[in-house]
Design a protein with these regions (language model features):
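Conserved beta-strand hairpin/beta-sheet module of binuclear metal-dependent hydrolase folds
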Residues: 1-52, 156-165
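Divalent-metal (often Zn2+) His-rich catalytic cores of metallo-beta-lactamase-fold enzymes
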Residues: 77, 192-247
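Short, glycine/acidic-enriched loop or turn micro-motifs at the edges of active sites
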Residues: 9, 25, 34, 65, ...
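C-terminal regulatory/interaction regions
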Residues: 236-298
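Active-site neighborhood of phospho(di)ester-bond hydrolases with catalytic His/Asp-centered motifs
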Residues: 30-33, 56-63, 82-84, 146-148, ...
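Active-site metal-binding motif and surrounding structural segment of the metallo-beta-lactamase
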Residues: 39-86
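Metallo-beta-lactamase
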Residues: 90-145, 151-217
């Protein structure tokens, strides 16, 4: 059984999820959220009849702080953390990850949004290859390496359920599928390949960290909408890059573009605030500019 745990990020609902799976060997967790939501995580796990100490296996889709920022705290309680090989060094020695995040969010934003990040001992970090299967009790999870949003991204398949992290986008309270495009790894072509892989799987649901379950009947429409949105964002950004505009100049224009897109989808102001909480438009400016710089100057 899968339990969707709302981590109440920034005291708002439906923004960041973790997922608790019950197995014969005890509960396992997919995603941890940031350490700033560790208390809501603890309370949500307790609400399902477990303690955090019961969780010995944690699967993260990628090492961005909204997905894996509390992994160290679960490791301190004895959990093994399963992740992409490219992520191990950054979770074991997070100085570069912290420096990169601080450049994006600033010192104040780091503390307010993500809180503390500590190293995880190498022996508690289990790297998982593409299509490798991990067995926990009577449960198996299969790793699909799914780059595009991040080079260290894994979508975890449990039976006909897929925990898709950010590669399957953001969808809040029935709104449109939106692509999170933070720096430094955005690669449109790789992302499209990952979406083709997901489309090829036989699934009952896709579980989005931002936020919740997409049922089988809606999966292909959701992924098509996400891909179209990803291309729309990238194509909007290209002329601004080619004109040599700076991120500070582009950001308010892009924010207005995204808000207009959400308004056209009849997203309410309350929903818009949740989208911005999960996937702030300003964050994608640097990611898309970097994508075009790498693509056009290589």
């Amino acid at each position: 059984m899968i339990h969707v745990l709302d981590l109440k990020f920034q005291n708002k609902p439906d923004t960041i999820a973790a997922f608790l799976i019950e197995t014969s060997a005890g509960p396992i967790l997919v995603e941890t959220g940031p350490y700033s939501t560790f208390k809501p995580l603890k309370e949500a796990v307790q609400g399902k009849g477990y303690t955090l100490e019961d969780i010995k296996h944690v699967f993260i889709t990628h090492i961005h702080l909204d997905h894996a920022g509390a992994a160290w705290a679960l490791a301190e309680l004895g959990a093994t953390i399963y992740l992409h090989p490219f992520g191990k060094q950054h979770m074991n020695a997070p100085s570069k990850l912290l420096a990169s995040a601080t450049r994006i969010y600033g010192e104040e934003g780091m503390e307010r949004l993500w809180s503390t990040l500590k190293p995880i001992p190498a022996e508690q970090l289990k790297t998982v290859e593409h299509q490798e299967v991990i067995t926990v009790g009577d449960t198996t999870l299969k790793a699909w390496h799914t780059p595009g949003h991040a080079v260290h991204h894994i979508a975890w398949q449990w039976g006909e359920e897929l925990f898709a992290g950010d590669v399957a986008g953001v969808k809040i309270e029935g709104g449109p599928a939106m692509p999170p495009c933070p720096p430094p790894d955005i690669n449109i072509e790789h992302w499209q390949e990952s979406l083709r892989l997901i489309r090829s799987l036989k699934l009952n649901h896709i579980y989005l960290t931002h936020f919740g379950a997409i049922p089988a009947a809606q999966i292909h429409r959701h992924l098509d909408e996400l891909e179209a949105g990803l291309l729309r964002w990238a194509n909007w950004m290209r002329p601004h890059y080619e004109q040599g505009k700076k991120a500070a100049e582009i950001t308010p224009l892009f924010q207005a573009f995204v808000k207009q897109q959400l308004a056209a989808a009849e997203v309410t102001e309350a929903q818009y605030d949740l989208y911005e909480n999960a996937n702030p438009a300003w964050m994608s400016v640097a990611g898309l500019l970097r994508y075009w710089r790498k693509k056009l100057e290589q």
